[in-house]
Amino acid sequence: MLETKRIARVKALVHNLTRWSGWMGIVGVILFATAWFWFPFPIENFRQYDASRCITDRNGEILRTTLSPQGQRCLPIPLADAGKWLPVAIVATEDKRFRRHHGVDFLALSRAIGQLAWNREVISGASTISTQLVRLANPRPRTLPSKIIEAFRALQMETILSKDEILEQYLNRAPFGSNLVGIRAASLHYFSKEPTDLSLTEASLLAGLPQSPSRLRPDRHPQSAKKRRDHVLERMVECRFIEKDRSKASIQMPILLEPWTPPFLAPHFVDSILQGKLNLPSQTTLDLHFQKLTEDLITRHSSDKAHGTGVVILDAANGDILAMVGSPDYRNKRGAGQVNVTLAQRSPGSTLKPFAYALAMDRGLLTPEEILKDNPLNLPGYQPKNFDGNFRGAVSARQALIQSLNLPAIEILRRIGQKSFLETMQGLGLTTLNETRDHYGLNLILGGGEVRLLDLARAYAKLAQAKPGDTISPEAAFLVAKILSGNERDLAVFG
């Protein structure tokens, strides 16, 4: 009788537990669905990185990298540029079922809970690449509530991002020691290589670092780093990413680091981009080959007193900057070496004369063989002279341009009109000529204003590539270019 009552009580208890667990399950599902709706996944946190600025030339050669706003060196790259070995090494060591679960590895979670209950201590973890990514993007204290939130967010994330997108995000956000974030910064720092160039041994070393970046830094703790690397290689064998023989061969390899010195190239050019003076993307138009040739040329031909030398080379077809050197020696503080002469406002000297000649020819106000007077001229408070102080008398327009004579240039400016010429030069990009025509007077044609070398070079590029409908016609531009070309100039100067 007592046995029958005991059995009845047990059955009632089981029935009540089943009923309550059913109700609790329903409530849990409702709460989960409500949370999913009311707390949508913060995708905006994953659309940008706390990234460094990486300035490169037109071919992708790094000119300079900066630290991120948080003081990190982070150089995000697409998964396609992560190389052959790093992604699979990360998966093998951090989350071998990454491609099979949906953000939370319930099998690993069950194992971890069982081990904790049996051993009363944590034996293995159950975090996934997805949950780690959630924590990297939005750090929280490592508490049980935080882990529940991370698991919830990981489940949400897997419905929005693909596995490749999640892996790419993780590879760009994982810590690798010091202030290094992401695989590209780590690959460059430790091996002076892009991730695509890493060997299996090098990739497996990096893949082991996110577990404990400070303790496993190979430049400070090589033995610990090697032990972790070897573990990664063994995990790659378990996951069948590599053969055992290959793993054994890699384990025998010592750690060979090649510390990276961050480049500091084309300093004036890069400074101008970082300071907002040049509106260019991170992959710039500069050609490092031309840049080095230009720097070498200036170094060879500049004296100690020549602090104001600057060169800018443009692609005449589109105005792209191919090389920019702002001074002979960037590091010469005494000589103001960090001043970028190509962006400083300076007198253009006689460099505006070809534009005046072209404009006058374009408007039918001048022909190359027309005779002009190179005689003394008295202006109010000013007596312009030629560079050598001599006057030639009657000269052709061709000879006047080649010899850069001042008095004929003033006559041409008078024919064009000061206002018209000033507006033309402003339209060609010389925006620093922003005073009135009365401010400059006739001296404008002789260098009376201030322009930037870069703007002047771009104006000449437009002249060289003149098209129908431009301010100066192709025909007039051709005539001026022909006069100033080598053969014409030599004939006029040397006979």
Q: Can you say where each PLM-predicted feature lies in the sequence?
A:
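Short, well-structured active-site flanking segments
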Residues: R99-L109, V181-R184, K244-S247, G335, ...
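A penicillin-recognizing enzyme superfamily signal
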Residues: T284-D304, V311, M324, N332-V341, ...
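Active-site SXXK
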Residues: A89-V91, D95, M236, T294, ...
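Short hydrophobic alpha-helical segments used for membrane anchoring or interfacial signaling
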Residues: T56, V312-A316
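Juxtamembrane regions of bacterial inner-membrane/periplasmic proteins
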Residues: M1-K305, D320-L322, S327, N375
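Active-site-proximal helix/loop microenvironment
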Residues: A154, D219, A225, S250, ...
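A short, polar/charged loop-to-alpha-helix boundary motif
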Residues: C74-P78, D329-A344
